[in-house]
Amino acid sequence: MPRIQVTPPPPEHSSHPQLVGDLRRELADSREFGQPLIIEEPFARTEERRVTVVWDRFARLDHEERTLVILDAYDQDQQGALPRIAVALGYTFPEGEDEGVLPYEVAPNLRSGDVVTAEQCHQAMIQLGASVLRDPQRPSLSLPTAELAKKYVDRLIAILPQSREVWTIYGNMRGACNLTFTSSARISG
């Protein structure tokens, strides 16, 4: 059987340099909370990895352009890292929820008599990067792991100390993946 080796076309680059630069800065100076959420999953037998970036700023970009933003940002951040990325996926938070990438949701479960208000809870969630794309009146704080969801609850309690009893972590096991939180908002498998 013939063996065919295909020469790849020259690489394309993103037409959104501002997003590329912002994502590159996030890669260099990862924050503990907020957007974007960067998930890096290595493949078992290679040094290649799948990179998923969940970021509401992708809302107006098609999937191909999102991939170019991710690849260009990694290329600028770490020379030589680009060939190690086998798959680069970009989602908004609602898309990540729908695709099962973010199976855990942190939400307030307010009761009458609670000291904190829904508005205070929503503002604290937005401060930590909750998405308002799906519903501006109900921020969504979805995450890839239960461990990371717990870390977000701890931070929400630090922001609103009287909210300790209102936070609930909901799990949708449909898309739960085996990821481990390592540091800041960057996840590694």
Identify the function of each model-found stretch.
Residues 33-36, 76-89, 131-136, 158-189:
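Conserved short beta-strand edge segments in small beta-sheet-based binding/regulatory domains
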Residues 94-103, 148-157, 175-189:
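Short, low-order "capping/linker" segments at domain edges
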Residues 40-49, 91-97, 138-144:
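Short, charge-patterned binding micro-sites
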Residues 1-20, 99-110:
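N-terminal presequence-like segments and adjacent domain-start helices
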Residues 32-52, 124-136:
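Short edge beta-strands and adjacent turn/loop segments
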Residues 128-161:
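Short, intrinsically disordered low-complexity segments
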Residues 21-30, 107-129:
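Short amphipathic alpha-helix segments
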Residues 51-64, 141-148:
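A short interface-forming secondary-structure element
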